[in-house]
Design a protein with these regions (language model features):
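Recognizes extended acidic, P/S/T-rich segments that occur
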Residues: 1-12, 65-98
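Ser/Thr- and Asn-enriched, surface-exposed coil loops between beta-strands
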Residues: 3-5, 46-53, 60, 80-84, ...
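Beta-strand-rich modules
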Residues: 10-26, 93-113
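Pro/Thr/Ser/Gly-rich low-complexity, intrinsically disordered linker/stalk tracts
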Residues: 27-59, 113-127
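Short beta-strand/loop motifs in extracellular/secreted proteins, especially
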Residues: 60-65, 102
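GGW-centered surface loops in extracellular recognition modules
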Residues: 127-189, 193-196, 269
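Short aromatic-cysteine micro-motif
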Residues: 181, 208-334
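C-terminal, surface-exposed recognition/capping segments
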Residues: 275-278, 300-311, 317-318, 325, ...
Length: 451
């Protein structure tokens, strides 16, 4: 196999379709190969609190525009080669709004340079810490009690559209869609979570903030790096996982193969895992203040349809109809339209070490549960985001606690979550096991990109 540096063929940024064919003297040319879509843009990374580094610069881009939350802050000259780097000093930037984290992006500018934009990098919070929390996570009533700065906040559903006091609050106001290398991904900013538990390690309360919080008794504060969450269910093309609109979700693939297809995209990619899944789950609980996801939206009780069904919604969260396709914070099918495999749990153990995914682990352990109503999530203070099933209630009506079904057992089992049935035990916190090699016509996955 011969590799080729695509920079010498590619226009300055943008997207191009590349194909190839074999030629040899005395032989007929081969047919063209499959088409590969190559997308190029500048890359942005944080060097330290005062410096950002632009890589994959282009000679044709004589300058780079620097944006903070979409507002032009600076234009920095570039006179280097294709593939070069450029450091940007942001120490002198001023900001017009306190109480916000700023997402920095850059664009290359120059004659013949196609439209482009880097990934977003978040920089420090300006203003006082704002803490949004809920308690009551180990009570039989599904409703939660708002705490800290979330007291008095609310949300409403009208004509299948959600209006929420959290739309303007961190981190929800920064959960926007970005197009990165052809994928549609939702940005989750760097944040802190305060996670509380009782003497048995069962989850009792959770809070989110942009700055570190003080941990009280039986509480732990954890820092979460920024990451991207797939805006759509996973699709697979050419042995690689994508998050794209206008294509069918991929089913009938094992958890292990989904893992392989995600990693084929690069070292920073992975399929949905327990660690990142719980970050989103906790943010959902804080916004809606209920363990009963059905009380917010049910999601489509099937596994059909094309990705992008909710693209015409003009708000971050809503549904096409009661019980129809839904999205939350621009994440389509966050509940419903099929189950989704997630990594990080195997048999009766869990880990956040990606190198251990798909094998027996014991960083966090839990007991078998034979198909009942989930009553509690259990945490370990060393791994507080690996919230695993911690209790159950024999309640076939599923009208207490989390109101979702849980089944977990020892051996070579992997796990999925979500909804594709219309039963009351389906929902956001459903936890069900599969043989590791199993596939299903209603179980897919989702792409993550870490930073």
């Amino acid at each position: 196999m011969q590799g080729k540096d695509l920079l010498q063929f590619h226009m300055p940024y943008g997207q191009i379709q590349i194909t190839s064919k074999a030629k040899a003297e005395g032989y007929t040319d081969s047919d063209f190969s499959n088409v590969v879509v190559y997308d190029s843009h500048p890359h942005l990374a944080k060097v330290d609190s005062n410096t950002l580094r632009i890589s994959n610069c282009r000679a044709a881009a004589t300058s780079y525009e620097v944006y903070a939350n979409g507002v032009l802050k600076d234009t920095v000259a570039y006179s280097g080669e294709d593939g070069g780097t450029l450091d940007v000093d942001i120490s002198g930037y001023t900001y017009s709004q306190d109480g916000a984290i700023y997402n920095i992006t850059v664009k290359g500018i120059g004659t013949g340079v196609a439209e482009n934009e880097s990934e977003a990098v978040s920089i420090g919070w300006k203003g006082n810490n704002i803490i949004l929390g809920v308690s009551g996570l180990y009570q039989s009533a599904p409703a939660l009690t708002r705490t800290d700065d979330a007291v008095g906040k609310t949300w409403t559903m009208s004509n299948n559209v959600i209006s929420s006091d959290f739309d303007s609050l961190f981190p929800y106001n920064l959960m926007k869609r970005h197009t990165i290398d052809g994928d549609e991904l939702v940005f989750i900013p760097e944040l802190y979570l305060r996670i509380g538990h009782n003497a048995d390690g069962l989850l009792t309360d959770v809070a989110v903030a942009p700055l570190e919080m003080t941990a009280g008794e039986n509480q732990v504060v954890v820092h979460v790096d920024a990451f991207y969450f797939g805006a759509y269910g996973a699709s697979v093309l050419g042995g690689k996982m994508y998050s794209k609109t206008g294509v069918a979700r991929q089913y009938n693939v094992s958890c292990g193969n989904f893992r392989t297809y995600a990693k084929a995209r690069g070292a920073k990619y992975r399929q949905l895992d327990l660690y990142h899944m719980r970050v989103l789950d906790f943010l959902w609980l804080i916004e809606f203040a209920t363990k009963d996801s059905d009380a917010v939206m049910r999601g489509y009780t099937s596994s059909g349809g094309i990705c992008g069904a909710t693209d015409n919604l003009t708000v971050p969260s809503g549904q096409l109809s009661n019980g129809g396709r839904m999205r939350w914070r621009y994440i389509e099918d966050f509940i419903g339209n099929g189950l989704e495999f997630f990594d990080g749990a195997y048999g009766l153990g869990a880990t956040q070490d990606e190198s251990k995914y798909g094998q027996a682990v014991s960083d966090v352990t839990y007991n078998p549960i034979d198909g009942y109503c989930l009553s509690a999530l259990k945490i370990n203070e060393k791994y507080p985001l690996l919230a695993v099933p911690g209790g159950y209630e024999r309640n076939n009506s599923y009208n207490t606690y989390f109101r979702d079904y849980v089944h977990c057992g020892g051996g070579g089992y992997v796990y999925c979550r979500g909804r594709y049935y219309s039963s009351p035990g389906d929902g956001l916190f459903r936890w069900d096991d599969y043989d590791a090699s199993s596939t299903s016509s209603n179980t897919g996955s989702r792409l993550l990109l870490t930073l």
